[in-house]
Amino acid sequence: MTTRILGVVQLDQRRLTDDLAVLAKSNFSSEYSDFACGRWEFCMLRNQSGKQEEQRVVVHETPALATPLGQSLPYLNELLDNHFDRDSIRYARIIRISENACIIPHRDYLELEGKFIRVHLVLDTNEKCSNTEENNIFHMGRGEIWFLDASLPHSAGCFSPTPRLHLVVDIEGTRSLEEVAINVEQPSARNATVDTRKEWTDETLESVLGFSEIISEANYREIVAILAKLHFFHKVHCVDMYGWLKEICRRRGEPALIEKANSLERFYLIDRAAGEVMTY
């Protein structure tokens, strides 16, 4: 697994609580909601223009500017300036995942002419929140800074009533990982990759493929969401959902559904145009 922890920050809970109270009253964007199964949303703290309405991520070469919301969060700004090279920051966002929501397994940067170094600083989480990369599952702990290899297939999910909050920072892509996180403590010896998922069996697979009996345009999105979440609970590769979906649609025999399944895999894993949105 190329994703790894870079260090730990001792969070000031009082000051963090003050900033989170401001965020709780703020408007979160639904941009990129086509990547979500359930409620996944974000708000920009820093971006290319400093304008709150700039929501899409593009490759640029100038230090990110604070948005009005970002300027109103003194502690989060301090975390950004103290633990990252501010001249290398291109975007900073708060990403919130709510109960029983996940990101559909995907690869980032497919629509960009370049890529960033993406890091997560965990602000609030619990044991029912997980990240995945390919066939691995892991838990990012509170106060930890992680490098996420977003070019590989990955996902994230929250299966708790309490939302998960991460400060996600995109760093200029030519920096070395050793330069990304600064003024941090060494991580603890805890094992972040303990895998308690169930074994995958032929019987389970046939149960999943049984969706071919009922799949239709009316329930297609709901079935995609179920398939996207299975790898959080069973020992399978996160992209296996696309093979299952294509086989379900093939067994159903409806050309429109087969085309939708192929388009879904293409968009999330293979190729997508700048500004392209997936509707399904």
Swiss-Prot record:
GO molecular function: 2-oxoglutarate-dependent dioxygenase activity; metal ion binding
Chemical reaction(s) catalysed: L-proline + 2-oxoglutarate + O2 = cis-4-hydroxy-L-proline + succinate + CO2
pH dependence (record): Optimum pH is 6.5.
Chain positions recorded as 2-oxoglutarate binding sites: R164
Keyword Amino-acid biosynthesis appears in the UniProt entry: no
Keyword annotations: Dioxygenase, Iron, Metal-binding, Oxidoreductase
Temperature section of the record: Optimum temperature is 25 degrees Celsius.
Coiled-coil region list: none
InterPro entries in UniProt: Asp/Arg/Pro-Hydrxlase, IPNS-like_sf, Pro_3_hydrox_C, Pro_3_hydrox_C_sf
One Pfam family here: Asp_Arg_Hydrox
Record protein name field: L-proline cis-4-hydroxylase
Organism per entry: Mesorhizobium japonicum (strain LMG 29417 / CECT 9101 / MAFF 303099)
